[in-house]
């Protein structure tokens, strides 16, 4: 934050947390113009106790948002849908498939190069979007980024062009081709939601046989055993041929 100078037009700040109260403090320090909550998963549930508490902790981002600021929210998340939002923020809902949302993705398709979909925006219109990242979860991420940028006043077509040039960060969906084998390196971190998303993406990846090498998931508290077992079931449902843990 201290390295952001006057010449900086836009700064994207990730506000991580593992306990209640942390995001409120960060948001009051950053004073963002727009907030984004992508989903309510189970990361750090060992510290916070429940997804309801995780939702409350993430909504602390509102503490630093000014009056009328856009708050971009995942309309497919049941915890966010039930959440009571403060009056001073303006919710902007995105969804994979729900045309009642402010912004939605339809006709979603995946190939070895990434995802394509039709984006419908009640304010800006309809667009064909392509992103060089695989998995429906990355479509949701693209919608969140689009909502934030356009509600800050950026041109919708310019934002979509930017999404087409998106580059993954390290250890996220890096595909290496070795002697007829495609190795997908996607191991930056692991939680039940990211594991399920990766396995769902893997199912749609065009190949003959699928080998999944999965590591541990931490900070899950009492649900750790059940969460690991559920990921095993997800591997079966998503047609993994060989599973190594």
Where is each model-derived feature located?
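Active-site phosphate/ATP/adenylate-binding loop shared across adenylate-forming ligases
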Residues: 1-9
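Short glycine/serine/threonine-rich phosphate/pyrophosphate-binding segments
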Residues: 19-23, 139-142, 192-196
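Acidic, Mg2+-coordinating active-site environments of NTP-dependent enzymes
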Residues: 33-183, 207-208, 233-242
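Short beta-strand segments
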Residues: 14, 38-39, 74, 213-215
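Short, glycine/acidic-enriched loop or turn micro-motifs at the edges of active sites
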Residues: 17, 42, 77, 188-190, ...
């Amino acid at each position: 934050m201290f390295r952001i100078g006057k010449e900086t037009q836009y700064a994207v700040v990730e506000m991580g947390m593992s306990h209640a109260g942390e995001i409120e403090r960060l948001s009051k320090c950053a004073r963002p113009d727009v907030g984004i909550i992508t989903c309510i998963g189970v990361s750090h549930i060992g510290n916070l106790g429940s997804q309801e508490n995780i939702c409350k902790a993430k909504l602390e981002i509102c503490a630093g948002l000014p009056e009328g600021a856009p708050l971009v929210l995942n309309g497919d998340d049941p915890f966010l849908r039930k959440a009571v939002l403060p009056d001073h923020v303006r919710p902007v809902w995105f969804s994979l498939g729900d045309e009642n949302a402010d912004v939605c993705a339809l006709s979603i398709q995946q190939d070895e190069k990434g995802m394509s979909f039709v984006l419908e925006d009640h304010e800006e219109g309809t667009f064909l979007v392509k992103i060089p990242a695989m998995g429906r979860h990355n479509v949701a991420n693209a919608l969140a980024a689009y909502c934030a940028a356009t509600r800050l006043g950026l041109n919708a077509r310019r934002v979509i062009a930017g999404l087409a040039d998106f580059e993954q960060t390290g250890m996220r969906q890096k595909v290496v081709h070795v002697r007829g084998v495609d190795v997908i390196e996607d191991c930056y971190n692991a939680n039940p939601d990211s594991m399920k998303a990766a396995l769902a993406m893997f199912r749609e990846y065009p190949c003959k046989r699928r080998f999944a090498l999965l590591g541990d998931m931490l900070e899950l508290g009492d649900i750790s055993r059940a969460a690991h077992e559920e990921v095993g079931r997800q591997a079966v449902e998503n047609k993994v041929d060989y599973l190594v843990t």
